[in-house]
Each structure stands twice: as structure tokens, then as C-alpha cells.
A protein has these predicted regions:
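C-terminal outer-membrane/trafficking sorting elements
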Residues: 1-7, 11, 15-18, 577-667
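Extracellular, repeat-based ectodomains that mediate carbohydrate processing or recognition
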Residues: 20-571
Length: 667
């Protein structure tokens, strides 16, 4: 057993000077550690009234000459507050293609459930591929308040799926399956119980309710690992954690459920599996996934079990996994994935940081690439392809000076797919996109990039999505867009970022009502594929007040974001520029006219010093801003109308010796 001090966020600025460390960071290094994994059990009953955030973006209509495809977004269910989507669960949204259904599972309350309780569960469902929804169907109701303010069976962060009997094509014969923690207090504090059951889609009056408290050697926490296989296994993984003594018990709790037709419900059993973490003291996150035939499965955690080499004397997280080839009955492992060092993944060791980034990050003497320590971030997602190979969607970056922290300086972290093509003997890393901002803070809750992975129907292609605030001045991930990139591991082709062929991820919510406010998004494990080679990836996010998460939220469903096979292209090999030319493009600002804040994009072929000058029509300078050195790639920059009277202005972007001028109008 290991005594575990629950991790809290740490943002540090300083030189890392620790014993037995082989290199030092420059003084402006920014790093973070994992959030408290116990999450919030009892939310505030009321909150101080707050004004809706001034940063809350309204729907932006792009100019007619702009080649963009704004997604269609509709309102579906509601919830009493924003906490329900707050955890690391990755099964809030489920697609069941044989019945053309997609469901969103959440806690109740909000505008569609007046007076509803956040300890109850419900769902929203479409059986026509996401075009029309029936919302706020309640399936679980807390009833045991034991004389207190909060009900002991109040349900929290849910996992869910659609159980569709083999060969069925009628949604009425399918069931919603759910499994989550509750507040029965059997594991110390508020936590300790599980709430689970099923609900008939065809007969909404039929739903089951089952409760299981911590017992014997089983200490229940908040399971974030869930999958429902094609063979009908409902698989949950939790850590065995004694809250009263703040002790991780070096075990995972494997919870298997099978459909019992006699009781029209899933019946579960529990089993403990050894999972010692002597380095990190516990895991940061856990996931489980199976191949499309349900035969090959992986349980994967982020942790440090002292098996991996940690170069440079720094401590970080890495993937540790167990594998099953008999439909989840037995598990082999643990195995670990070496990210860094001489035996690490080449795509990380030799390609994650550029020479320029290494020079800017470390004090002399500059370490060799093989001596730089890398870590995963603190949440992730996994999928298993049609050949039984695991894909790990995770954010990686250099390990910080503090143990189990990650450098979060802009563009030093990236969303990647770590995958194998031979069952786990060899591992590769393919970058999906650079990340500008890591963590968002919303009142008393926070979330990181929430990276997720969605498979095509045949599990041959994968779509990795995450949240990022792509505004140059932003220091936190508080105004997130949804980014996504598709990857074909057989051909190594990836999707283009936009119609111009940008080598990077696609901004799903660009110019939509979700732009810069796609809070706590969720993606399904599998996408729709109505036409062969057309991949419709549904997303759900919370429309919420970012300053006050206790306020009711509206769930928003993105209906029509798609990739096609034609979007997958061979990525060009980047050339090393040796001349002095500066190739940069500056967009027209949007919105325009504006009052408040407007934005423009700057595309740099290579890094350079950038500044901004705003002047009147007569040439009088009224404002200047120096952005310093910006790296190559896309940058979203902002202009404020504060202290600018209504009128017409020019903004000039200076990129090295190049100048680009555009006209803007302040209302």
C-alpha cells in the first residue's frame, strides 16, 4: 500500500534546481500537476449571483467571402449545474449505428426539468442519426436522504452505453445502460457507493435501480473507465482507494456485467487486480476498451510503477496497461510504454521538440534529446482497432521540474496518438496538433484538454479531439474550441486542417455559436457513417456560465461535423528554410464591425518577432502591442476597442521586416 497525498494543481515559474537532475529549465517555464481526482461530491446549494462572463461569445456570422463550414448546433437536454460533465468519464455520448441512435447521458435538472435534482440521472436520445431528439428522459431517481440535505443515493459522474441485442435494428428493443458513483459515504467522506441499472428505450416506464456500497476489501471511488463490448460485456474499472485513510491500495477494481434476460438487467461481479504504483503513489486516470469483435481488450492507466526508465532524473507519468485476448476474462500485465530516453518512442524523443524549443526551454548546457524526460498529461482516452491494437489519445510534453508535472508553455505540449501495430511489441507516436493552453478554470472546477478518441465504424480510422483556447493573449484554456484530427494508422494519412490544406487539426466550432465556449465537451467512441467514407462525429458540450458552474446548463449537440476519405492526405515533409524571406498571412478581423473584442489570424511559415500597430485614417498611431517571438503556425490574436472611439482604423501587423495592413471598423 502507498499513502497518497491527493494531487492539486501547481503552476510554477522558476528555475528547477534539484539534486541529481541533469538539466535546468529557464526561469519562465510554466508547469502544472494533476487535479484532485476525488472531484466534487457535494456542490454548493446556492452561488453568489454573477453576471454572465463578458468573454461569453455570441454567434458570429463570417463575411460572405470566407470559406468556412459552420456546423449546425441544436439544444438538447439540461442539467442543474455544470458538474455532471466535469469528470474524466469518456462515455457521456454513445453512438449505436445499427439502430441509427445517439444518446447523451447526464444528471437531471435545469430548464427542461424544473425543480429537478442533480442526483438523478436522465438521457437525451435521437433515433434518426442526430437530427431530432427526445430529451430529459429520467431513468434514475435518488430517494434516500436519511434526513440530510443530500441524498445518500445521489448519483454523480456517470458512464453509459446503449445495449443493442445482437441482430436488432429496432431502437425500441434496445436499452440504456448506466453506471456511476453515489454519495452513500461507505468509503469515508461522501463517496463509496455505485448506482447502476438499465432503461428501456421503447418503454420509458421500465428502468432498474441498483445500489452497491463499499464492502470488505472493495473501496469504491469514481470510475472513469467504461466500455460495452459487442459480446455484451459491460466493463467498469475503478481504483481501489481508501478515502478515509487517503491510501491507494495498489489494486484496480474490475467490475464485469452481463445481461441477464430473466431480470432484464446487467448483473455485475467485482474482482481486484494488483496494480502497484510505487513511483507516483496512484494512477492519474484509467481507461478500458475492446476491439470491435469484443475479444481483445486493454486496461490502461497513467502512472509510474518504477518500470520505465526516467532520463534526466525527472519523474513523470507514462502509460501502463494490461491486455486480454479472451473477451475480458483474464488479463496479462502490467506492461509499460517507454516514452523517452534511448529506448523511447522516436516520434517523441527526436521530433516532439524542435532545436529552437530545446534552446529556449533549457539553460546551458543543453541536454541531448535522449536525456529529456517526457510525461503524459493527466487524462486520456483509448480505443482498440480492428486488428486488436491499442490507440492511446493523450497530451504529452516535457516533464516539469516538480515531480509528475508537465511543461504547459504554449506549443510545448501536443495531442498525440500512441499506438502499436503488432499487439504491443512496438509503439509509435503520431502528433495530431500542438496545444496552446492546457487548463481551464471555471469557478471552483477545472478541466484540462479533455482529449478523446472516436473510431470509424470498422475501427480502421481514428478521430482525436480536444479542447484548446487558440487566442494569442490567453493564458488559460477558459474559452475553448473543439479541435479534431483524423488518422489512418494503415496508410499514415491524416486529415487536413482546413480547405487550404493546412497541416494540422480542424477547429470544429470555428465561427459557430460554440466558438470559444465549447465547455466540457464529449465525443462518442464510434462515429456515424451514413455513407461509406463519410464520417459524422457528433459532439456535445455544455452551454454554461464559465464564472458560475452551479448555474443550470444547456447541453448543445453538434449535428453535422464530418470528414470524408478525401480529407485524408499524405502529410508533406517540412523543409528546413535557410533563406531570410518571411512568409506570413494575416486574415481580416472578425467580427467587423465590432464593439469590444475582435480577432484575426496570423499564419507564420516560420517563427518571427511580431507586433501590432493601430492607426487612424490620417495615420496617427493610437495603440501598439509587441507579441515578441511567435513560433511557426497559426495564431489567433485579439484587438480591443477599449479607448477607441467609433470609427474606421487600420491595423498593421509587423512580422520581422514584413508589414500587412487591414481595415477595421469600431461601432
Amino acid at each position: 500500500m502507498r499513502k497518497l497525498l491527493l494531487l492539486v494543481m501547481l503552476t510554477g515559474f522558476g528555475i528547477a534546481t534539484f539534486a541529481q537532475k541533469s538539466y535546468q529549465f529557464r526561469i519562465d517555464t510554466k508547469e502544472m500537476k494533476a487535479l484532485d481526482r476525488t472531484l466534487t461530491s457535494v456542490e454548493p446549494l446556492s452561488a453568489v449571483p454573477l453576471t454572465k462572463s463578458d468573454k461569453q461569445a455570441k454567434r458570429i456570422t463570417p463575411p460572405a467571402d470566407r470559406d468556412v463550414n459552420i456546423v449546425s448546433i441544436i439544444s438538447i437536454g439540461t442539467s442543474a449545474n455544470a458538474y455532471g460533465y466535469y469528470g474524466n468519464q469518456r462515455s457521456y455520448v454513445w453512438v449505436e449505428s445499427p439502430i441509427n441512435a445517439v444518446s447523451n447521458f447526464h444528471r437531471m435538472g435545469g430548464a427542461l426539468d424544473p425543480g429537478g435534482y442533480s442526483g438523478d440521472y436522465g438521457y437525451d436520445i435521437s433515433t434518426d442519426g442526430g437530427q431530432n431528439f427526445t430529451n430529459e428522459i429520467e431513468v434514475y431517481k435518488a430517494t434516500n436522504n436519511a434526513g440530510g440535505t443530500y441524498y445518500l443515493d445521489a448519483a454523480r459522474y456517470p458512464n453509459h452505453a446503449i445495449y443493442n441485442p445482437d441482430g436488432n435494428t429496432d431502437p425500441a428493443n434496445a436499452y440504456i445502460v448506466f453506471f456511476g458513483p453515489n454519495l452513500d459515504g461507505s468509503n469515508g467522506g461522501s463517496w463509496g457507493g455505485y448506482s447502476y441499472g438499465v432503461a428501456s428505450i421503447g418503454d420509458t416506464s421500465y428502468h432498474t435501480k441498483n445500489l452497491l456500497s463499499s464492502h470488505d476489501d472493495f473501496y469504491h471511488l469514481i470510475p472513469s473507465a467504461y466500455d460495452l463490448t459487442s459480446q455484451g460485456l459491460s466493463m467498469v474499472v475503478d481504483i481501489n482507494y481508501d478515502i478515509a485513510n487517503s491510501t491507494y491500495l495498489d489494486q484496480l477494481n474490475l467490475i464485469r456485467g452481463y445481461w441477464d434476460d430473466n431480470v432484464k438487467d446487467f448483473v455485475y461481479t467485482e474482482e481486484l487486480m494488483d496494480a502497484e504504483m510505487p513511483g507516483s503513489g496512484s494512477t492519474a486516470d484509467e481507461k478500458v476498451a475492446f476491439s470491435p469483435d469484443g475479444q481483445t481488450g486493454y486496461i490502461c492507466v497513467l502512472g509510474d510503477n518504477d518500470m520505465a526508465e526516467q532520463p534526466g532524473g525527472f519523474k513523470g507519468y507514462y502509460p501502463i496497461y494490461w491486455k486480454s485476448t479472451d473477451a475480458g476474462q483474464t488479463w496479462d500485465g502490467p506492461y509499460f510504454i517507454q516514452l523517452d530516453g534511448p529506448n523511447g518512442i522516436g516520434g517523441i524523443v527526436y521530433h516532439h521538440l524542435t532545436d529552437e524549443q530545446i534552446e529556449n526551454l533549457f539553460e546551458p548546457p543543453i541536454p541531448a534529446r535522449e536525456d529529456i524526460n517526457y510525461t503524459t498529461a493527466f487524462d486520456f482516452d483509448i480505443a482498440v482497432d480492428n486488428n486488436g491494437n491499442m490507440h492511446i489519445a493523450v497530451v504529452i510534453g516535457p516533464t516539469g521540474g516538480n515531480e509528475y508535472s508537465i511543461i504547459t508553455t504554449k506549443n510545448y505540449i501536443a495531442a498525440v496518438d500512441i499506438f502499436t501495430n503488432d499487439g504491443g511489441t512496438t509503439w509509435f507516436a503520431e502528433e495530431m496538433g500542438r496545444i496552446e493552453n492546457f487548463r481551464g478554470n471555471f469557478g471552483d472546477i477545472s478541466c484540462d484538454n479533455r482529449i478523446q478518441i472516436t473510431a470509424s465504424q470498422d475501427y480502421s480510422k481514428f478521430f482525436i479531439s480536444w479542447l484548446d483556447t487558440d487566442i494569442e493573449d490567453a493564458e488559460e484554456n477558459n474559452q475553448p474550441n473543439i479541435f479534431i484530427r483524423g488518422f489512418d494508422p494503415t496508410t499514415y494519412m491524416k486529415t487536413q486542417g482546413d480547405a487550404s490544406g493546412t497541416d494540422g487539426p480542424t477547429n470544429v466550432t470555428l465561427f459557430s455559436e460554440g466558438m470559444w465556449q465549447a465547455y466540457f465537451f464529449a465525443a462518442p467512441k464510434v462515429c456515424f457513417e451514413s455513407d461509406k467514407g463519410t464520417y459524422n462525429i457528433p459532439f456535445v458540450y455544455e452551454d454554461m456560465d464559465p464564472n458560475d458552474p452551479i448555474q443550470p446548463v444547456q447541453f448543445k449537440y453538434i449535428q453535422d461535423f464530418t470528414f470524408t476519405d478525401a480529407d485524408f492526405v499524405i502529410q508533406a515533409i517540412k523543409k528546413h528554410e535557410t533563406d531570410a524571406r518571411t512568409n506570413a498571412t494575416v486574415s481580416q478581423n472578425f467580427p467587423n464591425p465590432f464593439n469590444g473584442t475582435t480577432y484575426f489570424t496570423l499564419s507564420l511559415e516560420k517563427g518571427n518577432n511580431v507586433s501590432l500597430v493601430i492607426s487612424t485614417l490620417t495615420g496617427q498611431q493610437v495603440s501598439t502591442k509587441d507579441y515578441g517571438y511567435l513560433t511557426s503556425g497559426l495564431h489567433n490574436l485579439s484587438i480591443s476597442s477599449n479607448n477607441l472611439p467609433a470609427g474606421v482604423y487600420f491595423y498593421t501587423v509587423n512580422i520581422g521586416n514584413q508589414k500587412v495592413t487591414r481595415k477595421m471598423i469600431v461601432e
